[in-house]
Amino acid sequence: MIGRLRGVVIEKQPPEVLLEVGGVGYEVQMPMSCFYDLPEIGKEATIHTHFVVREDAQLLYGFNHKQERALFRELIKTNGVGPKLALAILSGMTATQFVLSVEREEISSLVKLPGVGKKTAERLVVEMKDRLKGWVSHDLFSPAEITLPARESALRAPDSSEEAASALVALGYKPQQASQIVSKVAADGMSVEDIIREALRSLV
């Protein structure tokens, strides 16, 4: 099993990053709450990974901290929640925000996440509340995770909006919904990551 990768960021296409380790390029899917903190292309990064083997694919999911990976693993233990939905959930909320929503039984917040209906939200609370008890109070997550970090904005390229919309679709949002929200929040001076961040904030 691949548990951690340390290498150079070769390509960033939300929510996927290509990391070169020892001459081998690893495609790693990351929650956007983790993706925002990745270094720039050409810089070195360390990613904690969860390896999934399916009949048709072998997939790597990556996280900045072991605790985020631990939460991802707790999520996929929940009935009806697979890796793709878990990725979408942790893209719409930081790990800390999700744990607090479950602890406080905030169904109204959870149903705003892509792929999460009322029944799924209720199941998340019922099945995970006891398992997540004390996670935040015991400082299992870093303070930086409580709010999304500000990033320096690069000049928005003409296809930034298209890339941002594609990333939202990959996370489970419907194409029309993704395009509409991107059009609403996108502005000059915003990078792809900036657009995605603002889109997710407005959706949740």
Swiss-Prot record:
Record bears the keyword Mitochondrion: no
Chain spans, region Flexible linker: 144-155
Signal sequence, start to end: none
Family matches, as SUPFAM superfamilies: DNA helicase RuvA subunit, C-terminal domain, Nucleic acid-binding proteins, RuvA domain 2-like
Region (Domain I): 1-64
Domain III: region residues: 156-204
Gene3D superfamilies with a match to the protein in the record: 5' to 3' exonuclease, C-terminal subdomain, DNA helicase RuvA subunit, C-terminal domain, Nucleic acid-binding proteins
A GO cellular component entry from the record: cytoplasm
Superkingdom to which the source organism belongs: Bacteria
Keywords of the record: Cytoplasm, DNA damage, DNA recombination, DNA repair, DNA-binding
Subcellular location per the Swiss-Prot or TrEMBL entry: Cytoplasm
Annotated InterPro entries: DNA_helicase_Holl-junc_RuvA_I, Hlx-hairpin-Hlx_DNA-bd_motif, NA-bd_OB-fold, RuvA, RuvA_2-like, RuvA_C, RuvA_C_sf
Assembly and interaction partners: Homotetramer. Forms an RuvA(8)-RuvB(12)-Holliday junction (HJ) complex. HJ DNA is sandwiched between 2 RuvA tetramers; dsDNA enters through RuvA and exits via RuvB. An RuvB hexamer assembles on each DNA strand where it exits the tetramer. Each RuvB hexamer is contacted by two RuvA subunits (via domain III) on 2 adjacent RuvB subunits; this complex drives branch migration. In the full resolvosome a probable DNA-RuvA(4)-RuvB(12)-RuvC(2) complex forms which resolves the HJ.
Function, as annotated: The RuvA-RuvB-RuvC complex processes Holliday junction (HJ) DNA during genetic recombination and DNA repair, while the RuvA-RuvB complex plays an important role in the rescue of blocked DNA replication forks via replication fork reversal (RFR). RuvA specifically binds to HJ cruciform DNA, conferring on it an open structure. The RuvB hexamer acts as an ATP-dependent pump, pulling dsDNA into and through the RuvAB complex. HJ branch migration allows RuvC to scan DNA until it finds its consensus sequence, where it cleaves and resolves the cruciform DNA.
Domain notes: Has three domains with a flexible linker between the domains II and III and assumes an 'L' shape. Domain III is highly mobile and contacts RuvB.
Homology family: Belongs to the RuvA family.
Name this polypeptide is given: Holliday junction branch migration complex subunit RuvA
Source organism (scientific name): Aeromonas hydrophila subsp. hydrophila (strain ATCC 7966 / DSM 30187 / BCRC 13018 / CCUG 14551 / JCM 1027 / KCTC 2358 / NCIMB 9240 / NCTC 8049)
